A protein has these predicted regions:
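Walker A (P-loop) phosphate-binding loop of P-loop NTPases
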Residues: 14
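A glycine- and Lys/Arg-enriched "phosphate-lid" helix/loop adjacent to the NTP-binding pocket
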Residues: 102-171
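Pre-Walker A (Motif I) flank of P-loop NTPase domains
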Residues: 2-6
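Conserved lysine of the Walker
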Residues: 17
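Hydrophobic positions on the alpha1 helix immediately C-terminal to the Walker A/P-loop
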Residues: 20
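ATP-dependent small-molecule kinase phosphotransfer cores
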Residues: 31-124
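Hydrophobic anchor at the beta1->P-loop junction of P-loop NTPases
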Residues: 9
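NTP-dependent small-molecule kinase module
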Residues: 23-25, 140-208
């Protein structure tokens, strides 16, 4: 059986990942293709428990290395339990965040550097996205959208980080897009939902 397609979607909070994930699901469902949508951190019972630890505002003392290791543990569990089996069944898998999030957030945002990529490549083994959609949005606009939609009180531990952290993350994403142009496609997320969707669908058409 032919291996399925693996698509990840990346970007800062407020960039519209959840909305575009639903659009990608619809793209494949309309074609009668079986699709599995999941998220990081999370996606399995164990990974969701790790997610609650990572995003809990009370865990402000978490060290950058501990944060990196918990993210990679969550990812390893998701790959082994959900993503790899689905790809082996020939399904399309779309994941809200994947390895690039760790490289951007912990590698660039926390300043841990190349160690993050090495640890996470070990966690995922041979499973990497065929296409990564990076929703490119200035972090200040992303934060404004999140605050307008949910309010400041609902922001999680990472969302509450200072803006200089989020700009380091953003620079990390841009560096990744430049380093891996054959896999990562940047989509201008300052535009309308429909304009973004049209550009994403054009990229999905290219995967055929």
């Amino acid at each position: 059986m032919r291996r399925g397609l693996f698509i990840s979607i990346e970007g800062s909070d407020g960039s519209g990942k959840s909305t575009q994930l639903e659009n990608i699901k619809k793209y494949y469902e309309d074609k009668g293709v079986k699709i599995l949508a999941t998220r990081e951190p999370g996606g399995t019972e164990i990974s969701e428990k790790l997610r609650s630890i990572l995003l809990d505002k009370d865990n402000s003392e978490m060290s950058p290395i501990a944060e990196m290791m918990i993210y990679s543990a969550s990812r390893a569990q998701l790959v082994d339990e959900v993503i790899r089996p689905a790809l082996e069944r020939g399904e399309v898998v779309i994941c809200d965040r994947f390895i690039d999030s760790s490289i951007a957030y912990q590698g660039y945002g926390r300043g841990l550097g190349d160690m993050v990529e090495k640890v996470n490549l070990y966690a995922v083994g041979d499973i990497m996205p065929d296409l990564t959609i990076f929703l490119d949005l200035d972090p200040a606009l992303g934060r404004k959208r999140v605050q307008e939609r949910y309010g400041t009180e609902s922001m999680d531990r990472l969302e509450q980080e200072k803006m200089d952290f989020h700009y380091r993350v953003y620079e990390g994403y841009k560096a990744l897009a430049k380093a891996y142009p054959e896999r990562i496609v940047s989509i201008d997320a300052s535009r309308s939902i429909e304009e973004m969707k049209d550009d994403i669908y054009a990229q999905l058409d290219r995967l055929k």
